[in-house]
């Protein structure tokens, strides 16, 4: 058997795509290896969201190439889509470049590359979605207590800071029956929890027997799977929130009381410049609606600091929004211009030192709220889903709370792996909880 090594960067959709690539390639006689130096085929599944993603890729490619000259090297993912032929110019030893929508063609690309000994590329946006081109055997093969399931891909929003519409294409929703079959297979393989994925997951509008279902209706349907205990979804857009999703949170106990809802800024001026097509007030109304229906619900978000034209007043509006919402956790980044996006063309770029100073202030507030939320759990007993992830200390195992907090307990008898266990929280830290199994 030949060795296959896949390195995945970026979002959960990339993790899902890497599993699909592994499954579509295995019939060619490949087995996954953990050491790139022992691989005959290396795939770098890339992300293009953060600054200097391409430069990091070329640095990594040089290291990979130095390990073993006779290996086949594939660049996949969003950098592959954005860079295209430029990858071959910068790294001539790369054999294949393939975009996210073309991974079903990987077997033929690999065969073609081996025969021609030349460069092979496919960064098309095919009319037939990639989900329809891959065989059923590629889906639902993940092992473990928590699994990813892509239900929607692509983006029609065209936020002025973002490359996703250009690298992932237009929004596409998979049919309900196809998703349900994959969910059944994942649960049969041991998944207690399913994470529904999409670039705009709550824009889901899948077909089912002549009807169009939204995300709320899909969740209620998937919840009928008897042995499935938890459902999550990510990532949502405020513009696509709808009534059936609110009601699903209120009525479906398997749906976790935690929503990742990126807002990016608290300034209406900046939100308009970002082409978000919602206001800070509308975002806060969504938060309030959720909390009225499900008082125990919590939120995380994404923030971009230093978008072109952002003033100190605009930034203070973001700080005020964070104070109002009080997030369980949040992710914040300095704005980095992405080539080809409208934001990159603007002349009113914010100085780097200003972005850095604002980011530190925002992260200080976010960290304070996260610690306070974690501290509020001390003394409570919460259900925690454990996997095979080990902690820093001997016999320690790590699981996830309903709110995506890392929870550490002692498992010296190896009893809790891949199970949901009631845990009494004894101590709170900045990004984790410590507890003991409660019987």
From Swiss-Prot:
Q: Which cofactor does it need?
A: [4Fe-4S] cluster
Compartment(s): Cytoplasm
Domain Radical SAM core positions? 141-372
In this chain, [4Fe-4S] cluster 1 is annotated as bound at: 11, 47, 78
What's the main place this protein lives?
cytoplasm
Keyword line? 4Fe-4S, Cytoplasm, Iron, Iron-sulfur, Metal-binding, S-adenosyl-L-methionine, Transferase, tRNA processing
Which residues participate in [4Fe-4S] cluster 2 binding? Answer: 155, 159, 162
Identify the GO cellular component terms for this protein: cytosol
Q: Which PROSITE patterns does the record cross-reference, listed alphabetically?
A: MTTASE_N, MTTASE_RADICAL, RADICAL_SAM, TRAM
Instruction: Kindly report, in one word, the top-level EC class recorded for this enzyme.
Output: transferase
Which Pfam families does the UniProt entry name for this protein? Radical_SAM, TRAM, UPF0004
Tell me which residues make up the MTTase N-terminal domain.
2-115
Q: Which reaction does it catalyse?
A: N(6)-dimethylallyladenosine(37) in tRNA + (sulfur carrier)-SH + AH2 + 2 S-adenosyl-L-methionine = 2-methylsulfanyl-N(6)-dimethylallyladenosine(37) in tRNA + (sulfur carrier)-H + 5'-deoxyadenosine + L-methionine + A + S-adenosyl-L-homocysteine + 2 H(+)
Note how many cofactor molecules are bound and how: Binds 2 [4Fe-4S] clusters. One cluster is coordinated with 3 cysteines and an exchangeable S-adenosyl-L-methionine.
Its job: Catalyzes the methylthiolation of N6-(dimethylallyl)adenosine (i(6)A), leading to the formation of 2-methylthio-N6-(dimethylallyl)adenosine (ms(2)i(6)A) at position 37 in tRNAs that read codons beginning with uridine.
Q: Which family does it belong to?
A: Belongs to the methylthiotransferase family. MiaB subfamily.
Instruction: Provide the assembly information.
Output: Monomer.
Q: What is the name of the protein in this document?
A: tRNA-2-methylthio-N(6)-dimethylallyladenosine synthase
What is the species of this protein?
Wolbachia pipientis wMel
